[in-house]
């Protein structure tokens, strides 16, 4: 067979392969139009795109075509099998990084820390936060920035994984912000407690970016010490409420994992009375835990039922202390450790809060302020600075 014939055959095979691939994609797209629509992917831990509604505006601005593309991508037949095969292919090819997430050892998916130094945005946030704390000097304030798995479990990252240094960034942020020099502010460093706790138990979920309730309990030891709270570990008892938890980092990364974790609730042995009011939804409940959240798409929402702009918790505690908590979702797992020691707690999530925080502080007689974030979200967050008020930016 001469060279010309070989090239001709190769060209024919390439054309046949391309034609077959296009035909297969078209066939799957057509079949997906008649395939039963799924709302949720259990393996990816996320909601799937639904059939888009045809509209003139959508066609003109291009949103309809984008929605169709998302719908076909999410609803093609046997999606879970294809997702698993893609994950298997990535593993075979040695791909350990997708969308900011590393596939680590021991079944862990670990969100990489992207920053390595203090930037201009960080400095502006420092200025705003310091101003807020100074003008509310009547409050005894605590700032607790929680290390994530990329710091505490850095040995589980894949070898050679390029990343920012979370510990170094934290130490630089605390140092340059001079926040610890404010007389009414205590910086609560829980890194040592977490580093010690991880030796005996699991402090982070393996497929989710949150810490476990055990991790929260370990950090609370240090927080209780700094807040002068008479906390004893034996005052709480752990109960497993979910034994097959898989987190949102699977869907974010595309790294399918069969790994499942447990979700535990730490309940005080002494009975307590609680009334939780969602100020925006104007609803009340007698527990900080949500059965609906536990049984929903994201079982981590068993804590508080999710994230809301403003929640008020009144307890049976006779301490007389009233806490204002500014937080991200990491704090949700720690609320249960706080309720026995505060008569009232107002919880503000700046991402969803639209009221005037300065006015809220002026109206309420808080004794304590706690700012609790994980370092990943704190480094990226812009909502906290916005909520701290216009006065701070002047």
What is the meaning of each model-derived region?
Residues 1-394:
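Extracellular glycan-modifying ectodomains
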């Amino acid at each position: 067979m001469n060279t010309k014939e070989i090239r001709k055959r190769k060209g024919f095979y390439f054309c046949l392969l391309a034609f077959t691939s296009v035909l297969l994609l078209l066939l799957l797209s057509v079949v997906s139009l008649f395939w039963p629509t799924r709302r949720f992917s259990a393996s990816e831990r996320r909601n799937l795109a639904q059939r888009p509604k045809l509209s003139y505006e959508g066609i003109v601005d291009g949103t309809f075509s984008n929605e169709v593309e998302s719908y076909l991508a999410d609803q093609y037949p046997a999606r879970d099998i294809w997702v698993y095969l893609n994950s298997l292919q990535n593993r075979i090819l040695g791909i350990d990084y997708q969308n900011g997430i590393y596939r680590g050892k021991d079944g862990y998916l670990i969100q990489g820390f992207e920053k390595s130094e203090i930037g201009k945005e960080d400095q502006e946030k420092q200025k705003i936060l310091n101003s807020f704390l100074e003008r509310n000097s009547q409050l005894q304030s605590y700032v607790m920035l929680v290390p994530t798995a990329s710091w505490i479990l850095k040995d589980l990252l894949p070898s050679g994984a390029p990343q920012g240094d979370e510990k170094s960034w934290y130490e630089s942020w605390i140092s340059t912000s001079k926040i610890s020099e404010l007389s009414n502010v205590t910086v609560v460093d829980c890194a040592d407690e977490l580093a010690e706790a991880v030796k005996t138990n699991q402090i982070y979920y393996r497929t989710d970016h949150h810490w476990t309730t055990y991790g929260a309990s370990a950090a609370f030891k240090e927080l209780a010490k700094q807040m002068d709270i008479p906390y004893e570990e034996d005052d709480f008892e752990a109960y497993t409420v979910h034994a097959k938890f898989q987190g949102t980092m699977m869907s974010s990364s595309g790294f399918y994992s069969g790994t499942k974790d447990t979700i535990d609730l730490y309940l005080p042995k002494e009975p307590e009375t609680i009334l939780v009011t969602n100020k925006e939804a104007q609803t009340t409940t007698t527990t900080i835990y949500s059965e609906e959240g536990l049984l929903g798409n994201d079982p981590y929402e068993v804590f508080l039922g999710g994230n809301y702009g403003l929640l008020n918790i009144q307890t049976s505690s006779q301490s007389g202390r009233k806490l204002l908590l500014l937080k991200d979702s990491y704090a949700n797992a720690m609320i249960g450790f706080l309720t026995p020691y505060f008569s009232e707690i107002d919880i503000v999530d700046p991402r969803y809060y639209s009221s005037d925080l300065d006015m809220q502080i002026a109206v309420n007689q808080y004794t304590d302020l706690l700012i609790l974030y994980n370092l990943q979200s704190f480094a990226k967050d812009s909502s906290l600075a916005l909520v701290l008020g216009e006065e701070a930016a002047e």
